[in-house]
């Protein structure tokens, strides 16, 4: 059964401006350690925009957004062997998911030159 749905779209140019202004402080705020290992220089802003939109979409599916103790670094977007995105939760995000009985988080991510979008469906396995 669907417990929550979230979506988010991010302008890659806005992320580039944040990178220019804040540099590593911005990446440290948004990314988990595992995600930072996947950083690449040539498409850094696009990668960050995808991660940012995915994390926002997950937080919306949890019904909190980025508040109530849920932070960007509580949501990790990794990849399965197949290349499909995989969501890992820690801290308050994990607690909120457990409170809602969420067992699976399905995520779809896409991007074009100027925009990144993510769509999330959180289910309880029923």
Say what each PLM segment does.
Residues 1-126:
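Core catalytic alpha/beta fold that binds nucleotide/phospho-ligands
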């Amino acid at each position: 059964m669907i417990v929550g749905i979230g979506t988010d779209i991010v302008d890659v140019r806005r992320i580039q401006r944040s990178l220019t202004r804040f540099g590593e402080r911005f990446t440290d705020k948004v990314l988990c350690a595992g995600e930072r290992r996947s950083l690449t220089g040539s498409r850094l802003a696009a990668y960050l925009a995808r991660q940012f939109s995915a994390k926002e979409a997950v937080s919306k599916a949890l019904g909190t957004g980025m508040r109530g103790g849920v932070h960007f670094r509580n949501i990790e977007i990794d990849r399965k062997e197949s290349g499909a995105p995989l969501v890992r939760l820690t801290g308050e995000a994990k607690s909120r998911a457990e409170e809602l009985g969420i067992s699976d988080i399905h995520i779809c991510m896409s991007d074009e030159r100027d925009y990144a979008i993510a769509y999330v469906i959180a289910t309880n396995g029923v």
